[in-house]
Structure formats: structure tokens, C-alpha cells
Amino acid sequence: TQPFTLTIDYLRVRFPTTDALEIIKNVLAMKSEYFIHEDYGMFGYEEQYIYGDISVNASKDSSMGVLLELRGMGCRNLEYVLQARGIDWYYFLSSCIDYQGVFKRIDLAVNDMGGLLDIEILRERYYANKVWKRSRTHEAVDSGKLSGTHGDTAKTFYIGSKNSSIYFCLYEKEKEQKSKGIKTDIKNRFEIRLKSGK
């Protein structure tokens, strides 16, 4: 088992077209009949096509374009499609660029499989000024269930402003998932969240 893995955990891309079916067919390389059509969309769009956590939002307003959103499981769903086609994320992202996609947000996740990143120690060192830090904005969150024990509390640490174009999120993925009744091999996760405008 690798101690660390890197993955894309969230992606939002806007395309300069009003044709959502074109994006499904040519960028996602999926069949539109696999998608559920809804007469409402996210982010002010008029309609959306949904396949699990893959969402393609469309509007007749050409200035809005088509917005592709992949949440965590949507990224995993797309990875299965890419594997079946024998291609990788690099090829897919290049295809987005070929279709003049504008990347509005991308989250890169480093998965710590062995527990090498200790979130509590990282928080303590940050507060004690024992790390170089460009951003002075931070937020610490402890989450869990009231019925649980202190050991069930999952720690999250944000570095940077959530309103900026880049910020970091470090959290105890295994404990977070356990509180939801989900088993995972990922102990901790470090996310780099990059975004460009609304």
C-alpha cells in the first residue's frame, strides 16, 4: 500500500456553449440517456443532467454556458469511466481545455493512508508559529456526535480564507467517515482548494 495517494476530489468547469448534451457526449464521453434530467439547476442554471454526483447544468443564457460539477463521488464515478476508456485525468482535463472549458474550482486531495499527518500536531505548530505561514487566516473545527467519545471527534483545520482563490483543508478522513458509518482506508486528507470567481 502506498503511504500517500493524490486525486482530484472536486471539479467545476464552465464551457462556452448552451448545449449540455454536447458536453456529456464529447467531454465526459458518456451517453446522455444514463443521466436524469431535471427542470432546475444549481448556481442559477435552468436545468441539469445528473449521473450520481456528476452534474451538468445548462441555461439558454449563453453568458452562463454549461457548468460541469463533479463532487467527491462524482470524481470517483468519472475515474471508472476514464479507466474503461483507457485514459486518465490528464487526458480528460486536456479535453476540457480543448472545448474551451474555464476551470472555476478544482480540489486536489493528498490521501494519507498510514496516518503520517497528525492534524492536532499540525494545528499546535501553526498556533505556536513553528511553521512558515503566508496566511494568517485559519479555522479549526472539531466535529462528531454528542453520544460519541472524545476519540470519535474528527479534527479539521483550514488555512487561508475560504473566500480567496486558494486555501487548504486538513482533516481526519477516517474519523469523519466513521461518524457516517462509512469505512475507509484513508486516515487523513490534505486538500488544496483552487477556485476562480463565481
What does each model-identified segment do?
Residues 1-198:
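Structured, helix-rich domain cores that form ligand/interaction pockets
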